[in-house]
Amino acid sequence: MIIDLAIDIGSTNTTIFQYGYGIVLKEPTVIALRQNRKIEVVATGAKAKRLYGKVSGNTQVISPVRDGVIVNSEALGLLVQDFLKRITPESFLKPRIKALCSIPCGLSLAERKQYEIVLQKSGVNEITIIDAPIALSRLIQTNGIVMVTGGAVTDIAIVSNDEIIEGITLNVAGDAINNAIIDHLYDKHNVRIAQATTEKIKLEIASLYPNDNASIDVIGRDIDTGAQKNFLVSANEIYTVISPIFEKLTEVIVSMLSYAPTEIADETTENGIYLCGGTAQIPGLSEWIANKTGLKVTLLDDPSSSVISALGLLSGEREKVANLLNLKKM
């Protein structure tokens, strides 16, 4: 029995697509481990994430991928192993698992190899590693700038004829927004807020519309007294916090185009930017990037699932993948 998978292991979430079935798993890239005589898996995914701040002693809650890089290969291996166990049927005969796995385009050779090693130890028999922008070229089917902005990193790449001409991975994405909001509220309102509150602010009122009048009531803890404190946060206030973050990304795009060969730069300018990833869903971002760069911006359908959708298409096209990666044999 052969199981054909596409796997997107992000710093925030891991998504698995099974050929013939679609997306079969989407869970936080988090695992809780207990260290006794041997390591014991306490919880994985959403259940493990709910344990943050609630465990002590010999139990740890671990995020094994940080900024797109594997920082705890043993923990990630156990996490992927558990995820695979969930989606593979129980059988006397162990299935042969083939997997196409996307990674950020800016990883080193050693960092890329680490994904292959972890997947192999987790029970994947045949592994193909592909840069996320290359995978997305199958979905977009045209040349241009691919921008994938997720939880921890943003990939920006000029893609031409299924090849990355210029590409970079930046540690500027959803987590950077959360941290900027936390720092701002600490400085301006003299409060500490929970991570869940930060996420709520981002999801409900963060936008790149400078005149957005939305606001939200927030509960935090006063830094000086430790008492609970209620205060109002406006979308306009958050705009001033997050716009410099995206300013960095647009500066990279403009710089990247200036170094690209003339013909490719002209073609890229004509086709514009293809935007996806969870953070791409911030209201007004497409228009803001278009205004800052002077380029057309296309927000892909279901942006948070664009990478796994592209991988899913490629999982049934092994010859296409071989061509993309210049391989003679998969």
Kindly give the residue locations of the regions a language model identified.
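Nucleotide/phosphate-binding catalytic cleft detector across ATP-hydrolyzing
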Residues: 1-149, 159-273, 280-302, 307, ...
